[in-house]
Amino acid sequence: PALLDRSVEPPIRVFESGSILLYLAEKFGALLPKDPAGRTETLNWLFWQMGSAPYLGGGFGHFYAYAPEKLEYPINRFTMEAKRQLDVLNRRLADNAYLAGDDYTIADIAVWPWYGQLVRNNVYSAAEFLAAHEYTHVQRWAEEIAKRPAVIRGQRVNRTWGDEDSQVPERHEAKDLD
């Protein structure tokens, strides 16, 4: 993804999800703690997602859900990695409401579409295969985030499939989502 911030002169170009999240959090002073420990913890998890998600999407998701031929070795290999990543998240969320601690941050925004939606069985139809029910803390976190009004609205942006009530194929103003 890419963003061009025309609210400044000269316009600033920003690309890649993590960079966009960090840029917007700094620009608007939200979703990124200001204290060094909280900020660092948030960035740790943001960058964890940047490094981990390709194994989930490009590895597990591809071989489990999309590959034209189901090959045992890559499915087993990437399943093991997906479960390891879910375990890392589950351990973190056992003692924390959100990834960086008590507050919802850009780390949660980055991680939830991949791992939260995975355990909710909304990507790859793999929750049962991965025994997602065993990751109870990830499940709790995923459900809490799914109920956030901004998340509910955000999932409708540029959506062209599913129930018509859940679609906003083109967005021009914030009121388009209300």
Where do the model's predicted regions map?
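Hydrophobic alpha-helical bundle segments that form small-molecule/ligand-binding pockets
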Residues: 89-100
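Residues at helix-coil transition
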Residues: 25-26, 51, 94, 120, ...
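Residue-level signal for nonpolar/aromatic packing positions in well-ordered secondary structure
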Residues: 3, 20, 89, 108, ...
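GST-like domain detector, emphasizing the conserved glutathione-binding G-site
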Residues: 1-76, 80-83, 97
